[in-house]
């Protein structure tokens, strides 16, 4: 009987050690993944777009404070993702924040860059955004964004163009399941 108990105890400890070994491997893989990905995302965090949103002119409905916070968050995140997509010449960073014509335009721009072996950087982004229309049903907002940033175009690691630009964008955003998305992002000469 004692022999059976000792064998059962050894089997139990062996099973715990195997589980612990698997857990240790899983933790090691997770730490390695974080170590590899952290530099990529920390760069983005350091260069987050500066966005100031004014909803005072919006009508016919006023923008509620929680909605304003979410729109501001998602607009900033969209520009950070746009910057990543253009720099990496990949649509992977877009996270579904661009839909409709905005997504089509951005996908085409990324594909064109990739075909030509180029990439772009949108550095030191500042966006002064005015909400000019907020639908009575709360299902669409029109924004006017005066954006200024440093635009760099690169061929591999070599900068082939570098300029400070001021661009006016008309933006249409609509709510999705858990965020606001950009449906239209159109550069215009002036407001």
Positions of PLM-derived features:
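Contiguous, function-dense segments enriched for cysteine-driven chemistry
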Residues: 48-49, 55, 59, 63, ...
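Bacterial N-terminal signal peptides
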Residues: 27-35
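Polar/charged side chains located within well-ordered beta-strands of beta-rich proteins
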Residues: 75, 124-127, 145, 150-151
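Short solvent-exposed loop/turn micro-motifs enriched in small/polar/acidic residues
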Residues: 77, 125, 164-166
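A mature extracytoplasmic/lumenal domain signature
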Residues: 69, 98-101, 109-110, 145-149, ...
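Short solvent-exposed beta->alpha transition segments
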Residues: 65, 91-136
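Short, low-complexity N-terminal intrinsically disordered segments enriched in polar/charged residues
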Residues: 44-100
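Exposed beta-sheet edge and beta->alpha loop/turn motif
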Residues: 3-22, 34-45, 136-191
